Amino acid sequence: STAVWLVDAPDLRAQAESGSPGRGGGRGGSPRPRELAAWLQIAADGTVTAFTGKVEVGQNIRTSLTQAIAEELPTPLSSIKLVMADTRLVPLDGGTVGSRTTPDMNLQLRKVAATAREALLDLAAMHWSVERATLTAADGRIRHPASGRTIGFGELTKGEKLVVNVSDRIALKPASQWTIAGTSVPKVDGHT
């Protein structure tokens, strides 16, 4: 079980931590931040905001990256807002070059979403004082089937950031079990 802390984050500014292990963008550059909140926030209403330095220029990465997050978290596509290329907010990740977004950023955001999922399961187990293994996550909610209890991701976090590091060793959903990623969905619109 991972220690998970909730901290009020009214003005989150994603930025790389100096001295962190890893590389940005897959081709050198600054290290990627390890803190989950640099990549993903869950608002009290359940809206998931994810951050990437990648730029949508017609290659439809907004949709594919949103699908990757929805698959691993798991939450509806409609609840995800992807902030792209806002240098005030997003982690430094080496830019949109060399056809690296899908192999690099898709994998990174899957790890981010899976780490968030595991942290939410840990929080719910503590919240309800139940065994973590008895919980499931689906559709933006944690469920305890034995008692019928359910709680939304936003209700659980109350809009506070999850303070946990993204794990490179996190278990990711195998492609054979995907129901969102890799499927045909309407293009995700970047305008709000």
Language-model-detected regions and their locations in the chain:
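Cofactor-binding beta-sheet edge motifs in enzyme active sites
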Residues: 1-8, 12-192
